[in-house]
Amino acid sequence: VVNEVSKTPIPGVYELRIDGNEIFYTDAQANYLIEGNIIDVRGKRNLTEERITKLTTVKFDDLPFKDAFTIVRGNGKRKLAVFEDPNCGYCKRFERDLQKVDNVTIYMFLYPILGADSVEKSKAVWCAKDQAKAWQDYMVRDVPVTPAMCDTNALTRNGEFGRKYKITGTPTLFFADDTRVPGAADATQIEKLLATATKG
């Protein structure tokens, strides 16, 4: 489904936005479909990447917090949202580093993208009596999760949200100033990003 057609800086070439955030290009008669990036060589800018970033920007306050659980440390004044998969090795390393960060509220979005086992583990964590404890026990202390049953539609919604906003890897971090960081950050980087986000 074509959502939008708009001009590009190249005469006769138009941008097609398809299925929400997919970008393609075409000629004025729509005889040709071009897949790839438009690079502004003089300006040293990837215009396609900039456009996708703009389309997939997520305002922190617009995150679907009802589909996350919270972990509060210290006064919880600073805020961080994280999309993670329980089978992601980088997420486990990130979680260990995150233990060193205090005075923060962490909104944890379970985002099982690494297979069926990730889905089962995410369901077990989501359905646990104490989600935060079950998550940290598994991710930091390697304590197996106990299977449990409950409404797990939040996991489906997290998957839909992630696809819509191109969350393609875990962990993906969101800060209160709308900064998005793909990949694991260490405690020092997290502290810097939280400090910057809190200034705003």
Please tell me what each predicted stretch does.
Residues V1-K123, D137-V140, P144-T170, A187-G200:
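Extracytoplasmic thiol/disulfide redox context detector
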Residues D19, A176-D177:
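Short strand-turn-strand beta-turns centered on an Asx-Gly dipeptide
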Residues G115, D178-T179:
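Short secondary-structure capping/turn micro-motifs that flank functional sites
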Residues K129-A132, Q136:
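Conserved, helical-rich catalytic subdomain that frames metal- and/or nucleotide-binding sites
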Residues P182-G183:
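Short, exposed beta-strand-loop hairpins at the edges of beta-sheets
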